[in-house]
Each structure stands twice: as structure tokens, then as C-alpha cells.
From Swiss-Prot:
Main localization, broad class: membrane
Naturally occurring in which organism (per UniProt): Aeromonas salmonicida (strain A449)
Domain of life of the native organism: Bacteria
UniProt cross-references to SMART domains, sorted A to Z: EFG_C
Gene Ontology BP terms: positive regulation of translation
Residue span, tr-type G domain: 2-184
Binding site for GTP: 14-19, 131-134
Catalytic reaction equation(s): GTP + H2O = GDP + phosphate + H(+)
UniProt xrefs under HAMAP family: LepA
Any GO molecular function: ribosome binding
Entry GO CC: plasma membrane
Matches recorded under PANTHER family: TRANSLATION FACTOR GUF1 HOMOLOG, CHLOROPLASTIC, TRANSLATION FACTOR GUF1-RELATED
Protein family according to the UniProt entry: Belongs to the TRAFAC class translation factor GTPase superfamily. Classic translation factor GTPase family. LepA subfamily.
Classification of source organism: Bacteria, Pseudomonadati, Pseudomonadota, Gammaproteobacteria, Aeromonadales
The protein's name: Elongation factor 4
Length: 597
């Protein structure tokens, strides 16, 4: 056991985690040079296309150290995006140490900090690594000082390497062996294995990634899932050397995968403990804290026949992605679908793309909302996550919206722009600290403003240099209203949005204008209105197409023309009272992007 090292790699987006893991795999000979490709661990097409890591991946490598011993390194590559921080905390729970990778050109960024603090709270050994030192813009000395100044860990002797060229990677491996402690555990105690991740394989059933804390696990053992009490036999067991390799068993302190023939998707929840069926462990390991979704949106299949397969797809996806929440919902405009909860807008986009690709579905999304707390006149408190669930205005005593605490790290020269942006988003500054050339700003901004497009706007005002980390702080009383969109006097429930009273007029006008462009012209006028309660705050009209009925008259009496025009008028009137307007697909999507341009 003393030759095992478990660690994860944490870093900000694009600081080179996945490339460094490629080099580690190559140096330790995990894959032959023929099988090697860039970002081996980003196994989803989506990850490769966007160049981001979404799922944490684990690998077991054997490394011959300079002291002559062979060490077993189990490492987990983690995502850097703020929406996927729960993946990071899960990975860290299975480790004794973490490599903190910092780009020697960019320096410390907000996500580096957030993930690093998570690691320190879990009492892991944090080993700083300065990456990308082959770049002309690299300033390892300045960045090392920055790490000491902002993060507060000793970084004078931080390893300098370039994951791209492979320079200094052997030093990184030596540091891992020297500084990260070996796992602690009792090989003879009853089995306790923590499920770090699970996914569904259509041939094998549920495959779980586990970290053995105490005891050991062998093929054909009978094991019990502690939360459900169900007993399963271990069919296959093994490790990833990125490829799935079968072994006879896993010892104490090791990380590997287990297949028990579980067909039920909720049979092995993430964060659960496995133990032996006979003489098992008394109590389960401390799992992970459940993450609460921050953004809710309705997802509806375009054709109602897809509803069943859509539900299966969500079931399978939620096994792999523990933070996805969903419940059935129906809408008069869109039929049956699900209300889904996500951690942020990126998470929502990724889930939607995964559903469309991996499960071949066509979906419509409604405008995302956050969770509001409402105190009613009778003194009870409710939480709502969709505009249609909002009670009538006269029953509401007060409405509270969620406030997020945002930590923003940025170079000084962009400070003006970023502060202006935060004020525009109704933010309140609570702290500001200078670290050399960097400024750390802390703002309290309403969650609804943060999740919508704050991240994109922040990146564009600071030319990509500012970085953001946010978390839910509290609920605060605020004047929120429900903005309804009416088409020819009928409310379209899927287009309703909850917004702040100050922005309501502006949002209403924007949505109405956007709708006017997108709804095709009919033979009669279509009135598009935005209303709050019974008060109309914006209106625009899609003008009717009309046929020139008098074209066939030439000269002659004017009463003939009048007769034809009046006949047309009658027809239009009847059409208007009977006509129905179909809202096209683009109109629902346009709501998501209102106010971006």
C-alpha cells in the first residue's frame, strides 16, 4: 500500500490539465504511441469539440521512480469549469493529494482558487505545478509569487514543466511520489468502497468507479450497496489504463471499476458505499453533499411520440451526471416534457447536446429560471422554479430572489469595465483586494443575472482575462414580476419569464420585437403583447397580408370596389376571431437569447 498514490489534477479552464495527463500516461507507458491521441481522457465527442473536460476520468499507471521502486499512480483528470465543480469535489474525495496546475503565462485565476480551497478543506496535499513554461509569455517567477500571495501555499520550489513538449514531466512524477502521502486504510477490515462515479453501459449494465478505503474486493465476491441494501455478485472488476482492463481484484487504497450486473439505473448511486454481503462494515462512508440545481428550464420533445424515449434518456444521463434533476411537466403550448434543474447555463447546453446526440432526440427548451422563495399572505413559504407555478399577485406577501456571491479575479486595466457590468447586473460590491497586478473583486449579484449571460459578458468586457467563481449565498427580498407574452389575447405559457420590475419594460419590449420578426405573417393582424398581471406594457403587431381584390375592376362605378373591399373586411374579421397562430420553434429559442445583442 505504501507504493500507491492517489491524486487529481485541478486547474482553471485551459491551463493544460488534460494535456498534462496525456504526458503522464505517455511517460508511464499506459498506451502505445500508436493509440496515443491528444486529450485521451476526454472521451465524449462533445468534450473534444469544445476542448473542455466535462466528466472526471480516472487512470491507473505504474511508474518506476528514481528510488528503484515501482509506484501505482491512480489519477483523476477533473473539469475546470465552474458549472462542473461538483465533479471536482467528488474526485477529490477519492484522493490524498492534488496537482494544482497553473499556466505560467496567465497566472492564478478564480477557478484555480475555488478548486484549491476545496482541496484544502478536504485536507489534501496540494502540489503546485507551473505549466506552459515553453511559451514566450511565461513568467514562472511572477506566477510562483502570485500562488504564494493569493492561494497561500509554498511555491518557490514548484515544478516547472511544459505538458505540450514533455519538458519536466518526469520531475512532476517525482514530486507526486515524494510529496503526496500514501493512502491510509486497513486491508483486513471489512470492505468499504466509495462509488465516485457511475455510468450505464448497454451490455454490462451499471459500471461504477470505486475507491477502496478499507478491505479489498475480488471477483465473484458478494457485495451489498449500503443505501439500498441490495446484494450483488461482482461479475467483472478492473482498472483503467485509459483502456478498461480486467483484473482479479482491487486492494486497499486502489481505484478501479466494478460491474455487478445491476440493471436498475438507481441501483448504485454516486457517493454510496459498497461492503461485503456477510460481515460487512457497520457504517457507510461520508458521501458527497448533494448539489442543488441553480437553473431550471423546461425541456420538451418536438414530437410527442418521443416522450418515453426522452424519459429513458434522462434516466440514463442522471446516473452519469449526479447533479441533473428532472420532474414531469406539461405545457399547453408544448405538450408533455420535463422540468430539469442544472448547475448553470453551460451545464444546460451540454445536457441538451448530449440528449440530442447520444439519444437522437429533438428538443425545445423554455427560458431558464432560478428558484425563487415566496412568502404568501397566510404566512407559508413556497419555492418555485417555473413562471407558471407563480401564485396570483394578490396572494404574495413578498418575493425573495437568490443572491450569488461572485469572486472575480482580473488584471487591473479591465477593472472599470467589469465594475460597470456588475452594477448593470444589480450587483453590490462587498470586497476588493489587490495582489500585484491582479485584483480580486467580490460581488453579490442576483443569481438570475449570473446564470443568464454574465459569464459571456464578463469574458468579452475583459478580453478573456477575468475569471469567475460563484456560489449561492442567500435569498433576499426583491420586486420580481411575471412577464406574460400574449398572442392575439391568448397567453403562451412557455414564453412567460420572471424578471425584476425595473427590467420588465425593457425585457417586454425586446421579447415583443423579437417575436414580431419571427412569427410569420398571416391573412389577419396578429397582436403580440407583453403584460404584467392585467397591465399591458409593450405591444407590436404583425401586419396582415392582403390580397388585392380590386385588381380586376377597371374604371366603372366606385360602389363595385366598395362592395369587394367590404366583403374582404368581413372575411378578415371572421378569420381574426377564428384564426389560430402557430408559434414557430425559433421563437422559443429566441427568448433564451433576448438581451444578448
Amino acid at each position: 500500500m505504501k507504493h500507491i498514490r492517489n491524486f487529481s489534477i485541478i486547474a482553471h479552464i485551459d491551463h493544460g490539465k488534460s494535456t498534462l495527463s496525456d504526458r503522464l500516461i505517455q511517460t508511464c507507458g499506459g498506451l502505445s504511441s500508436r493509440e496515443m491521441q491528444a486529450q485521451v481522457l476526454d472521451s465524449m465527442d462533445l468534450e473534444r469539440e469544445r476542448g473542455i473536460t466535462i466528466k472526471a476520468q480516472s487512470v491507473t499507471l505504474n511508474y518506476q521512480a528514481q528510488d528503484g521502486n515501482t509506484y501505482q499512480l491512480n489519477f483523476i483528470d477533473t473539469p475546470g469549469h465552474v458549472d462542473f465543480s461538483y465533479e471536482v469535489s467528488r474526485s477529490l474525495a477519492a484522493c490524498e493529494g492534488a496537482l494544482l496546475v497553473v499556466d505560467a503565462g496567465q497566472g492564478v485565476e478564480a477557478q484555480t482558487l475555488a478548486n484549491c480551497y476545496t482541496a484544502m478543506e478536504m485536507e489534501l496535499e496540494v502540489v503546485p505545478v507551473l505549466n506552459k513554461i515553453d511559451l514566450p509569455a511565461a513568467e514562472p517567477e511572477r506566477v510562483a509569487e502570485e500562488i504564494e500571495d493569493i492561494v497561500g501555499i509554498d511555491a518557490i520550489d514548484a515544478v516547472r514543466c511544459s505538458a505540450k513538449t514533455g519538458l519536466g514531466v518526469d520531475l512532476v512524477l517525482e514530486e507526486i511520489v515524494a510529496r503526496i502521502p500514501a493512502p491510509v486504510g486497513d486491508p483486513d477490515a471489512p470492505l468499504q468502497a466509495l462509488i465516485i462515479d457511475s455510468w450505464f453501459d448497454s451490455y454490462l449494465g451499471v459500471v461504477s468507479l470505486v475507491r477502496i478505503k478499507n478491505g479489498s474486493l475480488k471477483k465473484n465476491d458478494k457485495i451489498k450497496v449500503m443505501s439500498t441494501g441490495q446484494v450483488w455478485g461482482v461479475d467483472r472488476i478492473g482498472i483503467f489504463t485509459p483502456k478498461q482492463v480486467d483484473t482479479q481484484g482491487l486492494g486497499c487504497g486502489e481505484v478501479g471499476w466494478v460491474v455487478c450486473g445491476i440493471k436498475d439505473i438507481h441501483g448504485a448511486p454516486v457517493g454510496d458505499t459498497l461492503t461485503q454481503a456477510k460481515n460487512g462494515a457497520e457504517k457507510a462512508l461520508a458521501g458527497f453533499k448533494k448539489v442543488k440545481p441553480q437553473v431550471y428550464a423546461g425541456l420538451f420533445p418536438i414530437s410527442s411520440d418521443d416522450y418515453e424515449s426522452f424519459r429513458d434518456a434522462l434516466d440514463k444521463l442522471s446516473l452519469n451526471d449526479a447533479s441533473l434533476f428532472f420532474e414531469p411537466e406539461s405545457s399547453t403550448a408544448l405538450g408533455f416534457g420535463f422540468r430539469c434543474g442544472f448547475l448553470g447555463m453551460l451545464h444546460m447546453e451540454i445536457i441538451q447536446e448530449r440528449l440530442e446526440r447520444e439519444y437522437d432526440l429533438d428538443l425545445i427548451t423554455t427560458a431558464p429560471t432560478v428558484v425563487y422563495e415566496i412568502e404568501l399572505n397566510d404566512g407559508s413559504t413556497i419555492h418555485i422554479d417555473s413562471p407558471s407555478a407563480m401564485p396570483p399577485v394578490n396572494n404574495i406577501k413578498e418575493m425573495r430572489e437568490p443572491i450569488a456571491e461572485c469572486n472575480i479575479l482580473l488584471p487591473q486595466e479591465y477593472m472599470g469595465n467589469v465594475i460597470t457590468l456588475c452594477i448593470e447586473k444589480r450587483g453590490v460590491q462587498t470586497n476588493m483586494v489587490y495582489h500585484g497586478n491582479q485584483v480580486a473583486l467580490t460581488y453579490e449579484i442576483p443569481m438570475a443575472e449570473v446564470v443568464l449571460d454574465f459569464f459571456d459578458r464578463l469574458k468579452s468586457t475583459s478580453r478573456g482575462y477575468a475569471s469567475l467563481d460563484y456560489g449561492f449565498k442567500r435569498f433576499e427580498t426583491s420586486e420580481m414580476v411575471r412577464l406574460d407574452i400574449m398572442i392575439n389575447g391568448e397567453r403562451v405559457d412557455a414564453l412567460a419569464i420572471i424578471t425584476h420590475k425595473e427590467n420588465a419594460q425593457y425585457r417586454g419590449r425586446q421579447v415583443v420585437e423579437k417575436m414580431r420578426e419571427l412569427i410569420p405573417r398571416q391573412m389577419f393582424d396578429i397582436a403580440i403583447q407583453a403584460s404584467i398581471g392585467n397591465q399591458i406594457i409593450a405591444r407590436s403587431t404583425v401586419k396582415a397580408l392582403r390580397k388585392d381584390v380590386t385588381a380586376k375592376c377597371y374604371g366603372g362605378d366606385v360602389s363595385r370596389k366598395k362592395k369587394l373591399l367590404n366583403k374582404q373586411k368581413e372575411g378578415k374579421k371572421r378569420m381574426k376571431s377564428l384564426g389560430r397562430v402557430d408559434v414557430p420553434q425559433e421563437a422559443f429559442l429566441a427568448i433564451l437569447h433576448v438581451g444578448k445583442d
